[in-house]
Design a protein with these regions (language model features):
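Extracytoplasmic
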Residues: 2-29
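Membrane-interface helix termini in secondary transporters
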Residues: 20, 51-52, 56, 143
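Central cavity-lining transmembrane alpha-helices of secondary-active solute carriers
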Residues: 37-52
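Helix-loop junctions at membrane interfaces in 12-TM secondary transporters
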Residues: 79-91
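Cytoplasmic helix-loop-helix junction between adjacent transmembrane helices
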Residues: 91-131
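Helix-loop-helix hairpin linking two adjacent transmembrane segments in secondary transporters
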Residues: 126-173
Length: 174
């Protein structure tokens, strides 16, 4: 649940920060739409790849490195935006690549760790991270933006993913 929670706070924070980012850099709505959709360009590509990698190397490693990857690119988002519009698009595609393997990796873990009769409940529990992360991001991103600036929504949420990876990688076995 926590990885999915982090997935959604990292995914949603840009939609909350978008108006401020758009105003700061003078982007039009088309450019903003490209920023939003670039994430999904990477995301859709790794849906299939994530399943293949999880079957081959195990869901634990694939999920962990996916979180590490997308968290790293979440942290890079402000620097990318300040550098150039094009660089931000690249970073968002790369972030999507990391997030795209999340659910295939989870399903690989379910198949290996969770008895068949308990999988529906496990999936429901894990998927509860979607609305919880969404609510958290919609509430906390504006607070962080007011207190520290829009960039810190990306730094703080990305750092949470790095901390999660450290504990996951160290404590969870395949």
């Amino acid at each position: 649940t926590l990885a999915v929670f982090i997935c959604y706070i990292d995914r949603i924070n840009i939609s909350v920060a978008a108006v401020e980012i758009q105003d700061q850099f003078g982007w039009d709505n088309t450019q903003l739409g490209l920023v939003f959709s670039s994430f999904f360009a990477g995301y859709i590509f790794t849906q299939y790849l994530g399943g293949f990698l999880a079957d081959r190397y195990g869901g634990k490693s694939v999920l962990g490195y996916g979180v590490l990857l997308w968290s790293f690119f979440t942290i890079l988002t402000p620097a990318a935006a300040h550098h150039s519009f094009f660089f931000l698009i690249i970073v968002r595609v790369l972030m999507g690549l990391g997030e795209g393997i999340t659910f295939p990796a989870w399903h690989s873990l379910y198949a290996r760790w969770i008895p068949y009769q308990e999988r529906t409940r496990a999936i429901a529990f894990t998927n509860s991270g979607i609305p919880l992360g969404s609510i958290f991001a919609y509430v906390m991103t504006p607070i962080i933006m007011i207190m520290f600036g829009w960039e810190w929504a990306f730094y703080s949420f990305g750092a949470l993913g790095l901390v999660w990876f450290f504990f996951w990688h160290r404590n969870i076995t395949s």
